[in-house]
Amino acid sequence: MEKNGYVNFNFLDSKPNINSILVGLDLDYSNKVIAPDGHELALVAFIPIENLLTIAPQFKTDFQNMEYKDKAIYVFSYYDKEDYFLDYITEIDDAIQGYTKVIIGDKHQFKFNIDNFYPINPIENLDEMSFLGGQPEYLQQESDDFLEKYIFIGQILGMDLPEEVNEIFYLTENTGYIFINRDLSGGLFFVQTT
């Protein structure tokens, strides 16, 4: 399942649970996260850190000496079913300003509808563009200057997502990239287009 620190995955069509890495879409979660323009962000991923370390043990050195028990990475993104929203999620500057948000907190900090999410399934297909660990495979050239501050968690290709949620990055060809701060104080999420 590993290729130079990568763990490729697809999605299971099975009942999710709170201990799984989940990707989906929920706009009705508790403790709303708000963009600078007042728009409520959508919860698009839930990553329990202990589960991440089980699936991708290469992260253990990054989390060494960190308190991560019962913590999760929450990924929020600008989403609008009725209107164009791609510009809000493709610029790193917009992500830094809060049009997307990564929060590391208690596993129960946000109550959300778990049935709107799909658990990941680690696989051995090395051609998949959705994976945990390793280095990001950008669709467009991206400056790595900002990477020193972050740990790359993984990337998700829209077309790998189940049909019900495959437009959370606006187009299925788009890829979302998840990073966390090295001190676990938050992170960065943005999308690239082809």
Walk through the language-model features, giving the residues of each.
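Preference for intrinsically disordered or flexible, low-complexity segments
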Residues: 1-194
